[in-house]
From Swiss-Prot:
Family affiliation: Belongs to the universal ribosomal protein uS17 family.
Keywords from the named record: Ribonucleoprotein, Ribosomal protein, RNA-binding, rRNA-binding
Gene Ontology molecular-function annotations: rRNA binding; structural constituent of ribosome
Cellular component aspect of the GO annotation: cytosolic small ribosomal subunit
Subunit structure comment from the entry: Part of the 30S ribosomal subunit.
GO biological process: translation
Organism: Latilactobacillus sakei subsp. sakei (strain 23K)
UniProt-recorded name of the protein: Small ribosomal subunit protein uS17
Purpose: One of the primary rRNA binding proteins, it binds specifically to the 5'-end of 16S ribosomal RNA.
Listed HAMAP family: Ribosomal_uS17_B
């Protein structure tokens, strides 16, 4: 099935913060919310575990992950694609 036929699933873009596990990456997704009273934008971040079958994503890469069925106790996302590779200095 393609991504277009699964429109109801959430797709997030975030940065890989860990790839030490086999076939699993940790992705940090940052979002902004506006404070209801003061109107200031506040940054929120959340970490998600995602399935990476080919171990292609590395730390620092910007990736897109899509919601899927539960793959383990904590894993509910799978890697769609690597948007931007990390620059190695």
């Amino acid at each position: 099935m393609s991504e277009e036929s699964r429109n109801h699933r959430k797709v997030y873009q975030g940065r890989v913060v860990s790839d030490k596990m086999d076939k699993t990456i940790t992705v940090m997704v940052e979002t902004y919310k506006t404070h209801p009273e003061y109107g200031k934008r506040v940054k929120y971040s959340k970490k998600y575990y995602a399935q990476d079958d080919n171990n292609e994503a590395k730390v620092g890469d910007v990736v897109r992950v899509m919601e899927t069925r539960p793959l383990s106790r904590t894993k509910r996302f799978r890697l769609l694609d690597v948007v931007e590779k990390a620059v190695i200095i």
